[in-house]
């Protein structure tokens, strides 16, 4: 090994400390005199691994001897920059995906709240007890809109008609189903002022739940960054910078939630 490697080895050995151990460098003559009565270990490094092994090795033709009170060996691994960057990237990607999924959920929940115009998405949240198992209505029936104020439900299995009817009655849709034994028709009455206000409260609650979900995602990401800091993979300044970027992302998605909410509120209040 080159002289620079010996210097590096010496530096690592001087900085290495272990419980019940006393580490020091000895020259060749010390090794020759004390080899019979001294536990010895050597240092070697490969990539980002540091290992202390029992025995004697030579660097540039000269042995490096390490005294220890106990004959112990262990491997210590330090994360590479590439690995740290990969962990950061994974946290960022996961955070953005979860926030995007939250937006999709909010849209779906808003679509299930009826407005003046009939839409199959109004039935997205309705679950039917089908052979003892709750399933989504759209998975067991075809839903269409014959006109702007009605919905037509055609079940794939006619025996599920009663279960579908019951699910609609117990939902918060606010309509009465008409079951003719073949299909179910839903006629949507015009929204009254009071009903609009009630639905506006429902939408407001759904929006707030979405905002809470986004904040919780931010909290989880921040905890992940702090964990990397405790593991000495990130510095305090790194975490501050990442937290600032995370807050910008959070603000962006909070604005998306607010925008979707305002749009739905306008639809509800439109006569």
From Swiss-Prot:
Entry annotated with the keyword Chloroplast: yes
Recorded superkingdom: Eukaryota
Cross-referenced Pfam families: RRF (PF01765)
Transmembrane stretches, start-end: none
GO CC terms: chloroplast; chloroplast stroma
A biological-process GO annotation: plastid translation
Transit sequence range: 1-78
Keyword field contains Lyase: no
Gene Ontology molecular functions: ribosomal large subunit binding
InterPro entries: Ribosome_recyc_fac, Ribosome_recyc_fac_dom, RRF_sf
Annotated tissue distribution: Restricted to photosynthetic tissues.
Keywords from the named record: Chloroplast, Coiled coil, Plastid, Protein biosynthesis, Transit peptide
Residues forming coiled coils: 213-260
S-S bridge residues: none
Gene3D superfamilies xref list: 3.30.1360.40, Ribosome-recycling factor (1.10.132.20)
Localization of this protein: Plastid, Chloroplast stroma
Note: Expression seems to be light-independent.
Family the UniProt entry places it in: Belongs to the RRF family.
SUBUNIT field: Modeling onto the 70S ribosome suggests it binds to PSRP1.
Function: Responsible for the release of ribosomes from messenger RNA at the termination of chloroplastic protein biosynthesis.
Protein name per its UniProtKB record: Ribosome-recycling factor, chloroplastic
Organism: Spinacia oleracea (Spinach)
């Amino acid at each position: 090994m080159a002289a620079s490697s010996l210097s590096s080895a010496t530096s690592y050995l001087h900085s290495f400390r272990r419980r019940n151990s006393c580490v020091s460098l000895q020259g060749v003559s010390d090794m020759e005199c004390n080899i019979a009565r001294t536990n010895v270990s050597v240092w070697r490094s490969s990539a980002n691994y540091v290992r202390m092994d029992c025995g004697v090795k030579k660097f540039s033709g000269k042995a490096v001897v390490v005294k220890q009170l106990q004959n112990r060996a262990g491997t210590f691994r330090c994360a590479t920059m590439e690995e740290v960057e990969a962990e950061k990237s994974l946290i960022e990607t996961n955070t953005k995906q979860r926030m995007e999924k939250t937006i999709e959920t909010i849209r779906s929940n808003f679509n299930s709240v009826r407005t003046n115009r009939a839409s199959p998405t109004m039935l997205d949240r309705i679950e039917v007890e089908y052979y003892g198992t709750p399933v989504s209505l759209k998975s067991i029936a075809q839903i269409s809109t014959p006109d702007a104020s009605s919905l037509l439900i055609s079940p794939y299995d006619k025996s599920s008609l009663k279960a579908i009817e019951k699910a609609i009655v117990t939902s918060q849709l606010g309509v009465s189903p008409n079951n003719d034994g073949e299909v179910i028709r839903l006629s949507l009455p015009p929204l009254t002022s009071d009903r609009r206000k009630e639905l506006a409260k429902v939408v407001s609650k759904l929006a707030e739940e979405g905002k809470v979900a986004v904040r919780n995602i931010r909290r989880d990401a921040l905890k992940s960054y702090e964990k990397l800091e405790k593991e000495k993979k990130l510095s305090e300044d790194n975490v501050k910078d990442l937290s600032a970027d995370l807050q910008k992302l959070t603000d962006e998605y909070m604005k998306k939630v607010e925008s979707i909410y305002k749009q739905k509120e306008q639809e509800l209040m439109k006569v």
